[in-house]
């Protein structure tokens, strides 16, 4: 099990407001449809914001899991979770 800590500040141009989301641990979900899982998920940018860095933190990018790929609308990815499908794993979150 991989543990990590990540803090990201997101600005929403539609509401001109900022929300601060922090995720700690493995398989922890915080915020609206934010998915965080430890290890093996990789990077990629999709939806509004997708962060990987090998930690597999994906914010507002849709359902994604350790099975690989990013299901964000702008980056369909190439794994079983691509295209908005949830793989049913621990990373699928909300």
Curated annotation (Swiss-Prot):
Residues 1-25 are annotated as: Disordered. GO terms for biological process: sorocarp development. Belongs to the hssA/B family. This is HssA/B-like protein 51.
